[in-house]
Amino acid sequence: MLTHRVEPVYPPLARQIHKEGQVELRAIIATDGTIQSLQVVSGDALFLNSAKDAVTQWRYRPTVLNGQPVEIETYITVIYTLQH
C-alpha cells in the first residue's frame, strides 16, 4: 500500500507542445517500503526522468509474508494529462 506519493513534475517541453503520455515502470519495493530498483518498461522519452524522479520518492507499507517484511516487484504507470 502506497503511504507517500510525490506527484511528478510535468516536463516543460511536453507542456509547451501540449503532449500527453504515460510511463510504465518496473519497481522493486524493499522490505522497508522504499523503491530499491526502478526500470523503464515503456514510455515517451519526454516523461521518463520526471516519472523516475517522482516514483523513487514514493514510500510503501512493507508487504509482510509469514510475519516478515518481504521485497516485492510491481509495475507502476505514471500518466501525464494536461488540464483542458
Mark where each language-model region is:
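Charge-biased low-complexity segments
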Residues: 1-84
